[in-house]
Amino acid sequence: MSEQNSNPLQDAAPEEIEAAMAANAADELQRLQTELAELKAKSAELADQFLRAKAEAENVRRRAEDEVSKARKFGIESFAESLLPVCDSLDAALAIQQATPEQLREGADATLRQLTSALERNKVVTINPAAGEKFDPNLHQAISMVPAQQEANTVVSVLQKGYLIADRILRPALVTVAQPQ
């Protein structure tokens, strides 16, 4: 009974074994060549997708740089436009040959209002603390401390106004502060 369970290749002739192995090898070679072709195609597709994504990223970066460049170049344009009427008023004032002190004062006041309005439209806000207001080191710069008949560490006087732009200090207000008694 042991001979009936024997391996069929053991009973086959060497030529038959070689033919079977060659057929098996040919099938395996065909399968591997097909798999290799599929993997090469997938690799080429992924390489193409990578190159396209890389090119798109480069285009996005370049467009962003262009936008930033334009924003820097033209961002101040509206601010400059809002100051042009102030320049016009100053030119007109200088063109007057025989102005009285009252006229000069009125013109200066009107020009200052124009300038203040232009600054406010561009989110530049004046820091001008009132006397007696609590000293705030974030908004004020103390130039000196003076004896005063008011609470200590409060503003006595403003020597120079300060300015904020969009909640950022451009210049703190220069103030004198009441010293402790």
From Swiss-Prot:
It is found in: Cytoplasm. One of its GO terms (cellular component) is cytosol. CDD domains: GrpE. Keywords: Chaperone, Cytoplasm, Stress response. GO terms for molecular function: adenyl-nucleotide exchange factor activity; protein homodimerization activity; protein-folding chaperone binding; unfolded protein binding. Homodimer. This is Protein GrpE. It comes from Delftia acidovorans (strain DSM 14801 / SPH-1). The lineage of its organism: Bacteria, Pseudomonadati, Pseudomonadota, Betaproteobacteria, Burkholderiales. The gene is grpE.
